Amino acid sequence: KPLLAWTIEHCLAGGVDSVYVSSDAEGILDVGEKYGARSIKRPEEISGDEATSESGWLHALEVIEGDHGKVDWILGPQVSSPLRTADDIRKGLSVARSDLYDSLFSCSVAEDLFIWENRSGSLKSVNYDWQNRKRRQDIPRQYIENGSFYLFRPEILYQNNNRFGGKIGVVEMEFWKMFEIDSIEDLKMCSTLMKEFILMEK
């Protein structure tokens, strides 16, 4: 099954009203339509590796609102993150509809992750003070933006040209769901995790 198909199926089963695939490639649009998505032909000037997700979302939003009227929320899933489930999407939509937030991101909880940064050859601790190391239970809850999906109101995108704005919230996911596919090694790892945690449940 194509990688794109997993994301489309997650969105449809998770309760997304309308699912669109935006691309300048006919082959990708054909796959999207095969699995139940509608197509939006993306202009060449906002396609390719240099294009931002925001530019694609803005174009798609203008097309959709021009054809169908105002949109309440935008869900932007990452196709290379196949380890999410329809329940994760459903949970995200539920949080969005609570009207407590203006933008949301899927996340994994960062437990026992102490991050260091190399600044011009000098190592600096990023998310804790190594000179005042705290007990695990005393550390504030920290989140990893796992990129699986984002939810935001259209006005946030229009005003900020950014997926984030207003009051920002999170949709927590299990840690193993944060992995994405960018290499052959990633593909092997995600395949193993999917077989162990997702396909075994079906």
Each PLM stretch: what is its role?
Residues 55, 73, 82-167, 172-174:
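Conserved core of the sugar-phosphate nucleotidyltransferase
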Residues 44, 78, 108-109:
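Histidine-centered beta-alpha loop that forms part of the nucleotide-sugar donor binding/catalytic region
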Residues 21-23, 151, 181:
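Short beta-strand scaffold positions
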Residues 1-22:
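N-terminal glycine-rich phosphate-binding loop and ensuing alpha1 helix
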Residues 170-172, 177-202:
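Hydrophobic helical membrane-anchoring modules
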Residues 15-20, 102, 176-178:
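Short active-site oxyanion
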Residues 12, 20, 26-75, 84-91:
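Short phosphate-binding loop-to-helix
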